[in-house]
């Protein structure tokens, strides 16, 4: 297990904020008192990997002068199989049971209820593995709701039609796989003002890169880039993006390691290698590998021809050399009625 050896507060911490080690230690201790719930890890203590602990200490330990958290929105973008669901479930339980908030409302959101249920189900199993929480929590599976009895707080999965509703008094939102959102309606309902009555709400957005640059996820992704590069300022916004640069060699194991901070722990390098070799032999898999394994934003999920091979066809051709040769024509019948 790769542990965080020496913590250094995020560069997004403002000059007026401070790092409260006790608050951060408490958050880490709460999460590490939980257990993993799946596969060979099931029942074992949830020991935070170094990158996970960095995020938790930044979010729960960086406080404003009034003692409340500086960051209200966290955007975590990372490849698949890095432990996203477990981290999101642990954060949900911390906001529900360990944040000292009376009648806290924590919501699980995703493109559909089944997707949101993934994190919820992990949280339910974490509760069942933890005797201290089990006797203080009521689980309503049929409603996809967990109630923490001492503070009458709840964590609930929302249905798809919630985008047409208002009136939430949000303390926490766990937004899983933001890149799959078909539009921005649910995002706006849950993040625009729903937590204004709370002193330190946390909107925890965790996702893999997508393939739609017109989506709400790409909008948030671009905001994260703009803040990191100094073009925008938002002291309440925190982001971490793990991935490969567009011009990096996607077949290089060093690039895999850079993009996958849990490589060798939650996912074996042999699995990534096999997926890469398959993508090299089957060009249609390349974009999926780049998107899901390297967290690169791609223009489509399946590519018929690698762009380097397409670009290699851009050489001058003499029409005289083509005279007398067979010519092929093509028409594209797309939904927008374009003609090629």
PLM region descriptions:
Residues 1-331:
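Phosphate/NTP-binding elements of NTP-utilizing enzymes
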Residues 331-340:
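Residue-level detector of conserved catalytic or cofactor/ligand-binding positions
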């Amino acid at each position: 297990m790769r542990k965080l050896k020496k913590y250094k507060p995020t560069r997004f911490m403002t000059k007026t904020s401070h790092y409260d080690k006790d608050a951060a230690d408490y958050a880490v201790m709460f999460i590490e008192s939980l257990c993993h719930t799946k596969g060979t890890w099931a029942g074992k203590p949830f020991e935070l990997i170094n990158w996970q602990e960095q995020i938790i200490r930044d979010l729960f330990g960086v406080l404003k002068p009034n003692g409340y958290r500086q960051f209200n929105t966290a955007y975590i973008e990372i490849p698949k199989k890095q432990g996203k669901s477990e981290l999101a479930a642990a954060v949900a339980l911390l906001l529900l049971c360990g944040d000292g908030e009376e009648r806290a409302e924590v919501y699980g959101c995703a493109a559909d209820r089944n997707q949101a249920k993934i994190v919820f189900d992990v949280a339910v199993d974490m509760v069942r593995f933890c005797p201290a929480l089990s006797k203080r929590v009521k689980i309503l599976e049929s409603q996809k709701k967990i109630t923490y009895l001492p503070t009458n707080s709840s964590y609930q999965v929302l249905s798809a039609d919630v985008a047409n509703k208002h009136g939430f008094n949000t303390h926490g939102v766990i937004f899983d796989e933001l890149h799959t959102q078909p539009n921005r309606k649910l995002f706006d309902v849950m993040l625009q003002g729903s937590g204004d009555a709370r002193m330190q709400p946390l909107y925890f957005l965790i996702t893999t890169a997508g393939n739609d640059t017109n989506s709400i996820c790409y909008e948030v992704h671009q905001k994260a880039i703009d803040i990191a590069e100094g073009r925008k300022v938002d002291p309440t916004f925190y982001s971490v993006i793990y991935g490969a640069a567009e011009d990096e060699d996607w077949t290089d194991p060093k690039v895999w390691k850079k993009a996958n901070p849990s490589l060798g722990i939650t996912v074996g390098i042999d699995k990534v290698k096999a997926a890469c070799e398959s993508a090299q032999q089957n060009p249609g898999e390349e974009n999926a590998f780049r998107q899901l394994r390297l967290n690169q934003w791609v223009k489509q999920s399946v590519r018929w021809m690698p762009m380097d091979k397409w670009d290699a066809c851009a050489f001058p051709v003499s029409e005289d050399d083509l005279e007398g040769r067979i010519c092929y024509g093509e028409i594209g019948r797309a939904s927008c009625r374009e003609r090629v």
